[in-house]
Design a protein with these regions (language model features):
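Conserved active-site alpha-helix within GNAT-family acetyltransferase domains
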Residues: 105-131
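A short beta-loop-alpha structural element at the N-terminal edge
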Residues: 2-14
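A conserved beta-strand-loop-helix scaffold within acyl/acetyltransferase catalytic domains
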Residues: 29-41, 46-47, 53-64, 68-70
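A short, internal acetyl-CoA/4′-phosphopantetheine-binding micro-motif in the GNAT/acyltransferase core
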Residues: 70-77, 106-107
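C-terminal "cap" of GNAT-fold acetyltransferases
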Residues: 124-151
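Conserved acetyl-CoA-binding loop-helix of GNAT-fold acetyltransferases
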Residues: 78-91, 103
């Protein structure tokens, strides 16, 4: 298995994998258009051509980025793929000069194992103003904001 930059021919598999978790309310859904528009920010773990994990890097400000759409195929869960994808995103973020990597998540225990700590969502104004204001869950957000300092 290896982590690669996503390419356009990966989008259908990426969409299908994200949809499984979006339908469960675990991650936000992503449209095909959104995936194509952010293709350069997506990383995939492949095994024999099959995408078994995906993660996105979304820059929010001068030193802040978010890990988005982190999902691993259920058949491969528990094998460290999620952690490898988080570390890949962190590595790429450092190359861009990013110092703080955040996630809004329901998976607090997983992200804690990846060196993230819980913070107030309101301590991340870049995220709140960019995305949260237009989210239907804004006033009743039940996701946990977590941060990892990477530089």
């Amino acid at each position: 298995m290896e982590i690669l930059n996503a390419v356009s021919t990966d989008v259908k598999q990426i969409h299908q994998l994200i949809k499984v978790y979006a339908d469960k309310g675990i991650v936000l859904p992503r449209s095909y258009l959104s995936l194509y528009q952010h293709l350069q920010c997506l990383y995939v773990m492949k095994e024999e051509g099959k995408i078994v994990g995906v993660a996105g890097l979304h820059v929010l400000g001068e030193d802040l980025a978010e890990i988005r759409s982190l999902v691993v195929d259920d058949q491969y869960a528990g094998n460290g793929i999620g952690r490898l994808l988080v570390n890949k995103v962190a590595e790429e973020a450092v190359k861009l000069g990013i110092q703080r990597l955040i996630s809004l998540t329901y998976e607090q225990e997983f992200f804690a194992k990846c060196d993230f700590t819980v913070v107030s969502r309101h301590s991340l104004p870049e995220k709140v103003w960019v995305d949260c204001m237009s989210c239907p869950k804004n006033d009743a957000c039940d996701e946990i904001a977590m941060i990892r300092f990477i530089a």
